[in-house]
Amino acid sequence: MSRTAPRNALYAQSGGVTAVINATAAGVIETAMRHKRHIDKVLAGRHGIVGALEEDLIDVSKESRETIRGLRHTPAGAFGSARFKLKGIDQNRAEYERLIEVFRAHDIGYFFYNGGNDSMDTAHKLSQIGEQLGYPITCIGVPKTVDNDLPFTDCCPGFGSVAKYVAVSTREAALDVASMAKTSTKVFVLEVMGRHAGWIAAAGGLAGRKAGDPPHIILFPEIAFDRERFLARVKQSVETQGYCVIVVSEGSATADGKFLADAGTTDAFGHTQLGGVGPVVANMIREAHGYKYHWAVADYLQRAARHIASKVDVEQAYAVGKAAVELAVAGHNAVMPTIVRKSSRPYRWTVGSATLAEVANVERKLPRDYITEDGFGITAKCRRYLEPLIAGEAYPPYVDGLPAYVRIKGVGVKKKLPPFKR
């Protein structure tokens, strides 16, 4: 086949999903459909890169235009995601060769990998081995992570909606606690995601507008946890405000690097498995002060809450999907679309790009000047950064009082290769 003929594209979702990753999928698919001179069919990996390895591919052309359009307002990963990190090329060349074999069998010339830090690394490695094996493949990393820790982009699609959920939940829960504090609950602890970066925890700070407003304490991974200082601040808050609302990142740790809630296990990417910092902190307070408490873990709720998604986040998620295809057909390879902030007030942004070599495996943490001097709150500079990202509402359609989310048919592509044994 002539290499000037249109080739197929493969889209895959990776890692933890978000409220808007499907909007990115819609951006990729709808834009690819408009570039018939370059792209023939769009395929998707069922459960991400695992589907690609197992030649378990979905024919997206079998989905209706209404379903693809409906992805814009549907949370989670419509095509299935996976926590599966490819090892280095030298460590497990067979996996990379298998992917190229699958690409060759299905004439896949474009690969769009929608994920976070590790996914950008995988896309970069694939672009390299494609060259080594003499198979031309355009690899574009498409940004997605609620943790907001990818470098070279002002923000990451998925973060704005989580930030909005956490800010709203913090404000609403604080009103509840304030109502009950006289005779009942004095402390409320909300545990949010964020293994090493405190962006999501910082978003809780948007719930308050003036001094004394909740949350009264935010615990960031970037600030070493000091038990005595923390307990003193809790007591001060209860004595002056009548109650205390705390937002704690799952990655909060002591000065020696020990996580407050280290479960002693790792996930498929090799990251420490965390969970349970909320009750750890709450019990610490009860033992020290005897206050009645409630704690909650936002967990999957924070990243699945499409009903309260940020309009800006939805728009940016679609935009990076669209830009990924436009970069690919323009001849770019091993790059990632980025969000570029032009101004904060009024908020203006555009789409740029960065090379995967720059982005891969780099983690962006919350800057120190975004955290107050005492380490328990956010600064005005942080607020200026965060506020535009949660702006606007993009409600899904409702039927019978519930969001009308779509589900794909997921028609599989006929396999051409023998099974792959991992």
Q: What residues fall within each predicted segment?
A:
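Gly-rich Lys/Arg/Thr-decorated short loops/hinges at beta-loop-alpha junctions or inter-strand turns
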Residues: A5-A12, L71-K85, K144-D154, S184-T185, ...
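Short glycine/serine/threonine-rich phosphate/pyrophosphate-binding segments
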Residues: T18-V28, A52-L53, A94-E97, N117-K125, ...
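C-terminal non-catalytic interaction/assembly regions of soluble proteins
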Residues: F259-R422
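Accessory alpha-helical/coil subdomains and C-terminal extensions
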Residues: V102, Y113-G115, D121-P136, I140, ...
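N-terminal phosphate-binding or glycine-rich loops at protein starts, especially the Walker A/P-loop
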Residues: S2-D56
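Glycine-rich oxoanion-binding loops at beta->alpha junctions
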Residues: M1-S2, E55-G109, D118-S119, R171
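Short, ordered loop/turn segments at secondary-structure junctions
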Residues: S14-G16, A44-V50, R83-F84, G116-N117, ...
